[in-house]
Amino acid sequence: MRALIIVDVQNDFCEGGSLAVTGGAALARAISDYLAEAADYHHVVATKDFHIDPGDHFSGTPDYSSSWPPHCVSGTPGADFHPSLDTSAIEAVFYKGAYTGAYSGFEGVDENGTPLLNWLRQRGVDEVDVVGIATDHCVRQTAEDAVRNGLATRVLVDLTAGVSADTTVAALEEMRTASVELVCSS
């Protein structure tokens, strides 16, 4: 059984946000268009970076590796899904990073406190497709954790957006090495 995991398509990661990735808004629309046509998913879930007090994950002088400018703060518009993302098919949202930095969707829990992996296993999911922002950070971590947890994993590369070309190329190679299948949505 296959599920789609939509990673962090939030206002702060799209143009105009505090940690914007170029192409984020267009990606939100593209994922919505894809969902309107895709019929082979038994489940669709999403992740959100959702910070309350993440400690040294936030910094006034970020290194953009382990520390970042404030972003996706709980209760702010930046933490909301981008308005171009159609959320009607999303069954559950998994919130990560409330009190620490978190990159993988598998570090997240839903509103009932259920971790993503448990949620997927309870529904018999054994295959996942991963899309979203950012290819070189949260998408990569989510995909690699999916493989580590025994799920057949594909990243739909054309439905991801990365921070920079160099780090995205490196992340794609790391995912390939980790047995993540890299494919296009069409």
UniProtKB/Swiss-Prot annotation:
GO terms for biological process: nicotinamide metabolic process; pyridine nucleotide biosynthetic process; response to antibiotic; xenobiotic metabolic process. Pathway: Cofactor biosynthesis; nicotinate biosynthesis; nicotinate from nicotinamide: step 1/1. PncA contains Mn(2+) and Fe(2+) in a molecular ratio of 1:1. PncA has only one metal center. It is believed that PncA binds iron in the natural state, although both metals can support enzymatic activity. Optimum temperature is 40 degrees Celsius for the hydrolysis of nicotinamide. Below 25 or above 70 degrees Celsius, the enzyme loses its activity rapidly. Changing H51A: 10-fold decrease in enzymatic activity with NAM as substrate, and 21-fold decrease in enzymatic activity with PZA as substrate. The mutant has a low metal ion content. The keyword Chloroplast does not apply. Keywords: Antibiotic resistance, Hydrolase, Iron, Manganese, Metal-binding, Pyridine nucleotide biosynthesis. Catalyzes the deamidation of nicotinamide (NAM) into nicotinate. Likely functions in the cyclical salvage pathway for production of NAD from nicotinamide. Its cofactor is Mn(2+); Fe(2+). Optimum pH is 7.0 for the hydrolysis of nicotinamide. The enzyme activity decreases rapidly below pH 6.0 or above pH 8.0. Changing D8A: Loss of enzymatic activity. No effect on metal ion content. Monomer. Fe cation binds at D49, H51, H57, H71. This is Nicotinamidase/pyrazinamidase. Coiled coil: none annotated. Changing H71A: 100-fold decrease in enzymatic activity with NAM or PZA as substrate. The mutant has a low metal ion content. It catalyses: nicotinamide + H2O = nicotinate + NH4(+); pyrazinamide + H2O = pyrazine-2-carboxylate + NH4(+). The active site is at D8, K96, C138. GO terms for molecular function: ferrous iron binding; manganese ion binding; nicotinamidase activity. Changing D49A: 3000-fold decrease in enzymatic activity with NAM as substrate, and 410-fold decrease in enzymatic activity with PZA as substrate. The mutant has no detectable iron and manganese. It holds the Pfam family Isochorismatase. Is inhibited by Cu(2+), Zn(2+) and Fe(3+). Most pyrazinamide-resistant clinical M.tuberculosis isolates contain mutations in the pncA gene, causing lack or reduction of PZAase activity. The keyword Cell inner membrane does not apply. SUPFAM superfamilies: Isochorismatase-like hydrolases. Its EC number is 3.5.1.19, 3.5.1.-.
